[in-house]
C-alpha cells in the first residue's frame, strides 16, 4: 500500500510545485523565502528534509541566516518575485524541475536606453541570457520541456565558439563577389557614420559576408568611458586634459550628421565599397602616435597635396561654389589613418587627385579621370617639387599646439601684485601730465568706486591675493591668443590701467612696441598730445599747463637731492633708471582719458557684462629725436596753398610731397623696403606701408573708435580690461584710405 501511495504523493507535490510557479498577489513572499533558506541550510548540513520538521525563522530576527542577493534573477524567479541565486541552474529551479530552462531574466529597459538596439545590451546581460528563448504560458499551464529545448538550441547559436560580430543589421540579401581575405583597415563597427538603409550598396551586404573573426576583442565593447567607442583620437585634439577633449569630441560626433554624404561613383567596384566599412581591431586601442606623421609628411603627406592645389582644377565631386571639395563643417581634425567618425577622408566630398583620398580607396579598381588611386599616381605625387612653405609646416604648427604650458603660471606666481603702488604711480602720472580740472575729475571717478574696492578686499589674505594674481595671469593667457587672432588693434590692461597684453595690429597702428608697453624697455615717448609749443610750455611750467592754485608740491626732506627736488624731474629720472609698464593714460589725450575713467567708474561694479563704445584719440609713439627731426623737416618745407606743414613735423596729406612727383628719393627707397621692415607679415605689407594704418594721424594723434569691457575675478573685483580699437577715416582730413 505504501508503494501505491508514493506516486500519488509525487503527483500531488508536482501539482503543488507547478502552482507555486504562478504569482499570487495574496501570498506572502517572506514565508516562501524563509522556507527556502531553511531548505538550503539543511541541505548544506546534509540533513534530510523529507520527513523532518522544517525550522521556522522569525523574519524580524536579526540573527537569522540571510540570503545573498543575486546579481540577476532567472526567468522563473523573476516572474514569481522571489529571491534567486547566482548559480545556474538555481536551487528553486532544480526543486521545481526547471533546471534545463533556468536562465537569466530580462530586465526592464531604462528610459534613456529605449532607443538603444538590443545588440548593444547583450554583452552586459551575462553569458546565460537568450533573447530568443521564451517560456510559453497559456491558461496557467507551463511547458518546461519545450522551453528547455528552445533555450538549449538558441543559446548555442548566439554564443558560438567562432565569435563573429556583425557590422550591419541582417536585413538584406547576401552580396556576391566579395573575397574572403577582404581587408578592413579603417572604420570601427560601432561607428554610426554608415546607415544600412541609406546606401543601397552597403545595405545589401549580409552579416556573414562582412563579419570578420575578432577573437581578441575585449569583453567591454560598449563601455561608455572608453573613447574608442566613438572613434575619438584624444591625442590628435588640442586639449590639455582628457575631459575637455572627450566633451569636444562628443559635440563633434553629434554634429557629424550635418555634413552631406559623399556621392558614390557607379564605376567603383563592390570590393572598394565594402572596404569603407571595414574594421581593424588593432587600431581602436592603439595610441595613434604615428598617425599624424603620415599626414604631414613633406613628400607624400596630406599637406603636400593641400599646399599644391590648383585653384582652377575641378574635382569629381565639386559642389557649386565649394570647388575645393573640403567639408562644410568639421570640428575634429582627422588624418588618413585616424579613427574619428567625422573624417574629412570618408564623409566629405572628395575631389580626386587632391590628396584627400581615403586609404581604403587604394582597393578600388578605377575611377575614370581619377589617377590618384593607382600606384603610378602615388609615385607621381611623391615626385612633386617641394613648396617653400613645407619646411615650416609640421604636426605641431598645423594642429596649433600651444607653445607654453599654462601650468607654469601657477608655479611662477609667488607674490601678489602691488596694486596700491600702481595706483599711486597713476595719480602721480595724472598730476604731472594733465591739468588740475582733468586730474580732479579722474580722481573723483576713482574715489566713487573706492568703497566697493575696500568692501571686497577687507576679507582677503595673502593667499587670496596670490590666487588673484594667478587668476589674472591665467585669464591673460587665454586673451593673448584671442588678441593675436583678432584683426583689430587690441590691448589688455589691469584694473589700474597698466598695459599687460598687446597684439601686432596695435603696434602697427600707434608705433608703441610690445617691449615698451610691457615695461621691458625704457619709455622714451615725448608726444604728450599737443603741438611742439604746447609740449614745451607744459615742460617749462611743471607739467600742469601753468595752472596755479592746485595741490602744492612738497619739497623733499633730504637736501642732498639738489636741483632734482622739483618733482617731475625726479620722477623722470627714476623712470629712466627703471622701466615700468605703460599706463593707459599715456596712450590717449587728456579728454579721452577723462572720459574713460568716468565710464570705468560706472562699469567697474555695476554692470558685470556691460560694454562701452566711445571715440578717442590715441597718441603716436614719438621720441625726442623723432620730434626734433620732424620739426626740422617741417620748417624746411615751404607752405603753399595746396598744403601746409603739420605742427609736429608730419606733412599733412594733400601737400606738395604727397604727389608722386614730389616724393624724394629717400621716401621711394623707404616705400620699397616696407615689406622687409614691416611690423606685420609680408602678406599685409600694403596695410603697413606708406599709406597704411601707420600713417593715419593728425598732429601725432589718431582718431579711433574703441570698445572695451571688464572681466571680474572670483572675488567680484575688476581683474582685466579688454579694449579693441578701430581707426576712423575722414575724407575731410585729407586722409588716404587703406
Swiss-Prot record:
BP GO terms, sorted: cellular response to starvation; gluconeogenesis
Positions of transmembrane segments: none
Keyword Cell cycle: no
Record keywords, A-Z: Activator, DNA-binding, Gluconeogenesis, Metal-binding, Nucleus, Transcription, Transcription regulation, Zinc
Segments for region (Disordered): 1-65, 255-278, 328-404, 530-579, 636-673
Domain PAS: 475-546
Compositional bias ranges of the Polar residues kind: 337-351, 530-540
GO molecular function: DNA-binding transcription factor activity, RNA polymerase II-specific; RNA polymerase II transcription regulatory region sequence-specific DNA binding; zinc ion binding
Domain of life (superkingdom): Eukaryota
Record field: compositional bias (Basic and acidic residues): 28-39, 51-64
CDD domains (UniProt xref): GAL4
Comp. bias intervals (Low complexity): 568-579, 636-655
Family according to the record: Belongs to the ERT1/acuK family.
Protein's UniProt name: Transcription activator of gluconeogenesis SMAC_06113
Amino acid at each position: 500500500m505504501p508503494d501505491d501511495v508514493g506516486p500519488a504523493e509525487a503527483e500531488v507535490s508536482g501539482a503543488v510545485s507547478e502552482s507555486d510557479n504562478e504569482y499570487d498577489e495574496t501570498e506572502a513572499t517572506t514565508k516562501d523565502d524563509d522556507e527556502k533558506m531553511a531548505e538550503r541550510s539543511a541541505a548544506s548540513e546534509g540533513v534530510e528534509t523529507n520527513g523532518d520538521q522544517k525550522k521556522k525563522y522569525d523574519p524580524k530576527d536579526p540573527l537569522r541566516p540571510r540570503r545573498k542577493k543575486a546579481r540577476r534573477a532567472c526567468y522563473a524567479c523573476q516572474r514569481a518575485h522571489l529571491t534567486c541565486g547566482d548559480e545556474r541552474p538555481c536551487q528553486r529551479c532544480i526543486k521545481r524541475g526547471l533546471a534545463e530552462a533556468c536562465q537569466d531574466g530580462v530586465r526592464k529597459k531604462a528610459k534613456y536606453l529605449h532607443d538603444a538596439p538590443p545588440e548593444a545590451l547583450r554583452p552586459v546581460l551575462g553569458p546565460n541570457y537568450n533573447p530568443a528563448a521564451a517560456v510559453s504560458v497559456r491558461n496557467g499551464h507551463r511547458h518546461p520541456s519545450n522551453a528547455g529545448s528552445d533555450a538549449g538550441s538558441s543559446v548555442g547559436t548566439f554564443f558560438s565558439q567562432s565569435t563573429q560580430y556583425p557590422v550591419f543589421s541582417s536585413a538584406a540579401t547576401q552580396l556576391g563577389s566579395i573575397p574572403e581575405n577582404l581587408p578592413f583597415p579603417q572604420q570601427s563597427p560601432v561607428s554610426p557614420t554608415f546607415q544600412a538603409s541609406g546606401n543601397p550598396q552597403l545595405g545589401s551586404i549580409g552579416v556573414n559576408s562582412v563579419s570578420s573573426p575578432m577573437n581578441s576583442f575585449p569583453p567591454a565593447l560598449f563601455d561608455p568611458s572608453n573613447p574608442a567607442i566613438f572613434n575619438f583620437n584624444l591625442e590628435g585634439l588640442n586639449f590639455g586634459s582628457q575631459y575637455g577633449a572627450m566633451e569636444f569630441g562628443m559635440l563633434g560626433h553629434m554634429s557629424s550628421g550635418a555634413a552631406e554624404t559623399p556621392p558614390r561613383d557607379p564605376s567603383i567596384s563592390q570590393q572598394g565599397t565594402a572596404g569603407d566599412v571595414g574594421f581593424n581591431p588593432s587600431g581602436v586601442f592603439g595610441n595613434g602616435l604615428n598617425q599624424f606623421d603620415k599626414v604631414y609628411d613633406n613628400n607624400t603627406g596630406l599637406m603636400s597635396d593641400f599646399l599644391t592645389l590648383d585653384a582652377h582644377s575641378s574635382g569629381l565631386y565639386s559642389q557649386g561654389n565649394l570647388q575645393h571639395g573640403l567639408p562644410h563643417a568639421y570640428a575634429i581634425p582627422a588624418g588618413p589613418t585616424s579613427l574619428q567618425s567625422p573624417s574629412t577622408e570618408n564623409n566629405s566630398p572628395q575631389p580626386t587627385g587632391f590628396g584627400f583620398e581615403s586609404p581604403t580607396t587604394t582597393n578600388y579598381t578605377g575611377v575614370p579621370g581619377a589617377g590618384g588611386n593607382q600606384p603610378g599616381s602615388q609615385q607621381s605625387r611623391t615626385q612633386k617639387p617641394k613648396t617653400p612653405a613645407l619646411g615650416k609646416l609640421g604636426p605641431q604648427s598645423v594642429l596649433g599646439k600651444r607653445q607654453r604650458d599654462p601650468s607654469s603660471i601657477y608655479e611662477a606666481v609667488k607674490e601678489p601684485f602691488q596694486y596700491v603702488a600702481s595706483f599711486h604711480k597713476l595719480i602721480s602720472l595724472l598730476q604731472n601730465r594733465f591739468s588740475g580740472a582733468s586730474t580732479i575729475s579722474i580722481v573723483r571717478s576713482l574715489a566713487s568706486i573706492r568703497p566697493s574696492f575696500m568692501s571686497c578686499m577687507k576679507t582677503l589674505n595673502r593667499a587670496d591675493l596670490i590666487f588673484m594674481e594667478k587668476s589674472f595671469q591665467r585669464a591673460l593667457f587665454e586673451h593673448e591668443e584671442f588678441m593675436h587672432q583678432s584683426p583689430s588693434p587690441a590691448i589688455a590692461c589691469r584694473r589700474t590701467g597698466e598695459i599687460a597684453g598687446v597684439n601686432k595690429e596695435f603696434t602697427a597702428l600707434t608705433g608703441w612696441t610690445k617691449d615698451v608697453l610691457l615695461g621691458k624697455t625704457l619709455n622714451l615717448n615725448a608726444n604728450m598730445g599737443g603741438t611742439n609749443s604746447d609740449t614745451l610750455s607744459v615742460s617749462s611750467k611743471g607739467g600742469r599747463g601753468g595752472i596755479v592754485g592746485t595741490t602744492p608740491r612738497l619739497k623733499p626732506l633730504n637736501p642732498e637731492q639738489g636741483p632734482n627736488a622739483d618733482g617731475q624731474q625726479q620722477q623722470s629720472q627714476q623712470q629712466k633708471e627703471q622701466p615700468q609698464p605703460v599706463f593707459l593714460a599715456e596712450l590717449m589725450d587728456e579728454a579721452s582719458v577723462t572720459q574713460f575713467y568716468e565710464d570705468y567708474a560706472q562699469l567697474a561694479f555695476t554692470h558685470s557684462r556691460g560694454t562701452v563704445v566711445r571715440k578717442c584719440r590715441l597718441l603716436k609713439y614719438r621720441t625726442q629725436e623723432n620730434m626734433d627731426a620732424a620739426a626740422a623737416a617741417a620748417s624746411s618745407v615751404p607752405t603753399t596753398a595746396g598744403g601746409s606743414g603739420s605742427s609736429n613735423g608730419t606733412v599733412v596729406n594733400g601737400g606738395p610731397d604727397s604727389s608722386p612727383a614730389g616724393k624724394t628719393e629717400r621716401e621711394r627707397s623707404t616705400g620699397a623696403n616696407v615689406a622687409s621692415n614691416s611690423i606685420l607679415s609680408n602678406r599685409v605689407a600694403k596695410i603697413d606701408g606708406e599709406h597704411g594704418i601707420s600713417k593715419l594721424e593728425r598732429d601725432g594723434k589718431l582718431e579711433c573708435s574703441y570698445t572695451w569691457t571688464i572681466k571680474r575675478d572670483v572675488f567680484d573685483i575688476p581683474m582685466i580690461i579688454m579694449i579693441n580699437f578701430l581707426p576712423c577715416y575722414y575724407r575731410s582730413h585729407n586722409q588716404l584710405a587703406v
